[in-house]
Amino acid sequence: MTDWLDILKQQTAAGDQMSKTVTDMLADPAITEDQVKTLFDALEQQAEFVEKLRVALEKFDHDFPVIRAAERLEERYGDLAAGVAEKLKALRS
């Protein structure tokens, strides 16, 4: 049986690390458009995975705080992707 709570914990830890990594990368003045695009694509994939995780948690009737934690993680990846998209837009200007 899949341990959805363990997966959520792992993904939350990965999200914490990703937040720091994204911030550091976007602050680097030498970052290239290709690097930003790759970063955006990775964040989009991660957001899609977390969305599927949230749906699974809902399907298996986990408590609201667990589902809410997955929603917050999904929002975090969305916010990170939006920040990266802004950087990509700025680099293309």
Language model regions located:
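Short terminal alpha-helical segments
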Residues: 1-33
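Intrinsic disorder/low-complexity signature
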Residues: 3, 13, 38, 60, ...
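Short amphipathic alpha-helical heptad-repeat segments
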Residues: 7-18, 36-53
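Amphipathic, soluble alpha-helical interaction motifs
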Residues: 21-25, 52-56, 83, 87-90
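Charged, low-complexity interaction regions
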Residues: 26-36, 58-68, 93
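Short, charged, amphipathic alpha-helical segments
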Residues: 36-44, 64-75
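Amphipathic alpha-helical binding modules
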Residues: 66-93
